[in-house]
Design a protein with these regions (language model features):
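Cystatin/cathelin-like cysteine-protease inhibitor module
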Residues: 18-196
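Cleavable N-terminal signal peptides
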Residues: 3-4, 14
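Sec/Tat signal peptide C-region and signal peptidase I cleavage site
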Residues: 10-16
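Intrinsic-disorder-linked linear interaction elements in eukaryotic regulatory proteins
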Residues: 5-9
Length: 196
């Protein structure tokens, strides 16, 4: 018995030291660690997904919509009537105008197309990044189709033409070529105020 007490007395300091050094991780800390990892993974996945589906296109569209003209409390796209893209790249400009007109005629068969233009001089180019790494390039052009909507007014439609490129590869057209981004119905009295 004395021997057992002696062993117990010698073991107590060792047990006390072990319990101080090896504190188990609390449930709160475990949950915080899991949460941080999950948040980081979701953020990375969100960035990758955003690049794939073109979230920056939505940001770009908001920037494009900043150029809207307000008339009588309503916001309209400018009505462009001068084609600047044709001066630089005639073949691409003609293709865009032709495709935009065809898509417009299919969507609005009763409207009478007056003209179609690509008002920018060249492609608008952006760099696609994943974090701090360049993963590709993207370029955009917009074609506008203006049509008479019976005696009531006009229609002004904006079509997006987008191409993406991986480094060292050729540009590839987006699956929606062209993509109808926006159509404004414009009353007769407002139309002259929108001409650019």
């Amino acid at each position: 018995m004395v021997l057992m007490l002696a062993f117990l007395a010698m073991g107590l300091p060792t047990m006390a030291q072990k319990s101080n050094k090896a504190k188990p991780e609390t449930l709160v800390k475990k949950v915080q660690g899991i949460w941080k990892k999950a948040k980081k993974q979701v953020s990375e996945t969100g960035k990758e997904l955003g690049e794939k589906i073109g979230v920056d296109d939505l940001k770009k569209q908001r920037t494009e919509d900043d150029g809207l003209i307000e008339v009588e409390g309503m916001r309209y796209m400018p009505v462009y009537h001068y084609d600047q893209f044709m001066n630089k790249d005639t073949a691409a400009g003609q293709e865009m105008v032709k495709l935009a007109r065809a898509a417009f005629a299919k969507k609005y068969p009763r409207a009478q197309i007056l003209y179609s233009v690509v008002p920018q001089e060249d492609w608008t180019s952006t760099i696609v990044c994943n974090g701090e790494t360049v993963t590709g390039y993207r370029r955009r052009a917009y074609a506008y189709v203006v049509a008479k909507d019976g005696n009531d007014g006009y229609l002004n439609a904006r079509f997006l033409f987008r191409e993406d490129k991986q480094p060292g590869q050729d540009y590839v057209k987006s699956s929606a070529w062209p993509l109808l981004e926006r159509t404004d119905a414009i009353p007769n009295q407002v139309y002259p105020k929108l001409i650019q």
